[in-house]
Curated annotation (Swiss-Prot):
Similarity comment: family membership: Belongs to the sorting nexin family.
Name of the gene: SNX3
GO BP: endocytic recycling; late endosome to Golgi transport; protein transport
Record's keyword annotation contains Transport: yes
Name under which the protein is recorded: Sorting nexin-3
Record remark: domains: The PX domain binds phosphatidylinositol 3-phosphate which is necessary for peripheral membrane localization.
Pfam families, per the entry: PX (PF00787)
Amino acid sequence: MCPQRQFQSFTTTAESTLSHTTHKQLSGATIYDEPENFLEIEVCNPKTHFPSGDAKGMYTDYEIICRTNLPGFSKRSSSVRRRYSDFELFRKLLIKELQLSNHPKVSVQHLPGKILLSNRFSDAVIEERRQGLNKWLASVAGHPLLQTGSKVLVRFIQDPTFQG
């Protein structure tokens, strides 16, 4: 047979706990304030260009929209357009920057594959690539060491004249 125990009721426990503790009151505005540090990036709005008026030289670029309050970024919000080849250059420069700065723990994933098919300008293929680039850039920009220490990342995301 189990020995009998006396239990405090929930209200008694809650009353005794709350009466001895001072709680910080949060207002509705405080709860929904901007986070202390944030970086939001989205790859969106693909646009296919016909520079010579025909299929030769066609390319698609993507808008990169950024909102941040991180001190390493010069603008709180920005919008730039980038081609796939710009992403390739960015990845190459980022790897070089990491090698020179002794950050061996940071590995940069491969970009989504290059599209070599004749239907590379179809809406479905462009959307698939956009999603892949969005996921890839989010993983790169989401790394804390890159957010705070990569000048190449900042230039790629915010400088409209990014050339490497």
